[in-house]
């Protein structure tokens, strides 16, 4: 739904289907290879032309890291419920990672046990629709999630029953991503701040925003922080509101680009 709305507004919308699944870009601490995967994708799809970087959660963090690494690729940066982790909280994450205790406090404690196989797409839909977090999603978004987020399962437990599906995004890779959350964002932003305008969309009930806080994010985006009703997954809960908010920001960014040849670096306090 989001992509359709943005394309209908005249934008060319592209995205990497699954981060972390390409052997050339493994998941490691602080996600340098995932950042490079995004940069390679941008440079291949839009050579020499900066783009609007829009990302939710993981996508927002990687977009920020990409904009810091190679400022020339970013026309603007819009982070969707990807609160910037710095200071003592970032140091705590670093220590927990080093001690191999991060799984006790990160979402990986759930993802490592996540169900990943079903006898049919209908069974997968019923499974997620019954879960509280997914029940809040717009029905059409959940349908898209099943259609695009699952794939035929060649290792279905019941070989006599065709139609089995599994999660397309492997749970062990999702778990590894959670366990390698970047703890160096503050250092990256201090040394190589984005040279493009930056904005942030936050969920009013986002646990992630509440846990991380918004001090570093506000220092990065200044007045360009907007709230949308919902949890961390508000783009799936309120897709129309999210799509409209993104389009407003992109229009604002385009106007800024036309009026000024280059934006000053956005440096956190």
Indicate residue ranges for each PLM-predicted region.
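Short, surface-exposed "cap/lid" segments of acyl-processing enzymes
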Residues: 1-11, 15
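Aromatic pocket-lining residues of Rossmann-like dinucleotide-binding sites
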Residues: 6, 66-70
């Amino acid at each position: 739904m989001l992509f359709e709305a943005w394309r209908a507004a005249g934008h060319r919308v592209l995205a990497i289907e699954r981060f972390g699944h390409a052997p050339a870009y493994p998941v490691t601490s602080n996600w340098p290879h995932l950042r490079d995967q995004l940069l390679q994708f941008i440079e291949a799809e839009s050579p020499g032309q900066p783009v609007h970087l829009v990302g939710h959660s993981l996508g927002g963090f990687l977009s920020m890291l990409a904009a810091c690494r190679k400022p020339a690729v970013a026309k603007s940066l819009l982070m969707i419920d990807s609160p910037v982790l710095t200071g003592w909280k970032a140091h705590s994450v670093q220590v927990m990672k080093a001690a191999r205790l991060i799984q006790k406090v990160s979402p990986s404690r759930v993802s490592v046990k996540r169900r990943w196989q079903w006898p049919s797409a209908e069974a997968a839909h019923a499974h997620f629709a019954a879960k509280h977090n997914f029940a809040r999603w717009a029905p059409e978004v959940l349908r898209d999630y099943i259609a695009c987020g699952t794939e035929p399962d060649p290792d279905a437990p019941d070989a006599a029953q065709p139609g089995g599906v599994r999660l397309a995004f492997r749970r062990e890779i999702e778990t590894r991503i959670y366990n390698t959350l970047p703890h160096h964002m503050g250092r990256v932003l201090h040394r190589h701040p984005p040279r493009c305008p930056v904005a942030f969309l936050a969920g009013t009930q986002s646990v992630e925003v509440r846990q991380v806080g918004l001090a570093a994010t506000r220092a990065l985006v200044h007045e360009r922080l907007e709230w949308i009703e919902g949890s961390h997954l508000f783009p799936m809960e309120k897709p129309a509101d999210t799509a409209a908010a993104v389009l407003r920001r992109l229009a604002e960014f385009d106007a800024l680009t036309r009026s000024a040849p280059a934006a000053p670096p956005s440096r956190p306090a």
